[in-house]
Design a protein with these regions (language model features):
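Short, surface-exposed, charged amphipathic helix/loop patches that serve as local interaction elements
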Residues: 1-225
Length: 225
């Protein structure tokens, strides 16, 4: 199948991902083995093993440079191509909006790419430039021992490319991030929600048509969740 990666324009020249027509092979039973390998699931690598196996050879070699949004987009596109856009639940779930009991739902997605592609925030004497997270970034974050105890500051450490504070001679990025005022932290979250690329997956309630955020993991590829 051929997909258009949401962030294809953001890759450097020569990247195998910088194309509007990116080829993904149809999954086989061998690919399914990778997806449901219990050891790899436990380590958090099963989804990456699965996606990498679907890519052309050069893209496999540069898989770590793929943006997370594009990886998730491929997972979504493959799932819909395999099973359609309807998800059945093993047990009824309740719509958080209207309280309806759902046995199945329609899955959908939305890509948001802001017009301003610099991803820069100037606020409160700080100048912050954000970057797009890659598969390699996620793998480093997964191994970071501080992620559990310092989730917010460590997440910002990876999503922030550079940070400067007016009048400060501190150059250590993490030290500057830890000194960010709470009021600026609110501005950063607002910026990331409105001025930073997103790929959201959600299900639609058949009763009230409301959308419910949907988390993607290995079970995303089962016929019934």
């Amino acid at each position: 199948m051929v997909v258009k990666l949401p962030l294809h324009d953001f890759y450097p020249e020569g990247s195998p991902f910088k194309t509007e027509n990116f080829t993904v092979k149809d999954p086989t039973i061998e690919d399914e083995d990778r997806l449901f390998n219990p050891d790899r699931i436990k380590g958090g690598y099963a989804l990456d093993d699965f996606v990498r196996g679907l890519l052309p050879e050069e893209a496999q070699r540069q898989y770590g440079n793929m943006f997370l949004i594009d990886r998730n987009f491929i997972l979504y596109a493959v799932r819909v191509a395999m099973f359609g856009d309807t998800i059945e639940f093993r047990e009824n779930i309740e719509c958080s909006h209207c309280g309806a009991s759902l046995r199945e739902a329609t899955i959908d997605s939305e890509v948001f790419i802001p017009e301003n592609r610099k991803f820069e925030l100037k606020e409160g004497g700080y100048f912050i430039r954000f970057k797009l997270l890659t598969v390699s970034d996620q793998n480093v974050m997964r191994k970071d021992p501080l992620m559990k105890s310092n989730f917010l500051t460590r997440t910002l450490y990876y999503v922030i490319d550079t940070i400067e504070k007016e009048g400060s001679d501190i150059t250590d990025k993490y030290a500057l991030i830890r000194s960010i005022p709470i009021s600026l932290g609110t501005k950063i979250r607002e910026f990331l929600n409105t001025q930073y690329p997103r790929f959201d997956i959600f299900i639609k309630c058949g009763s009230c048509e409301s959308t419910i955020p949907f988390e993607m993991n290995e079970s995303f590829f089962w016929n019934k969740l």
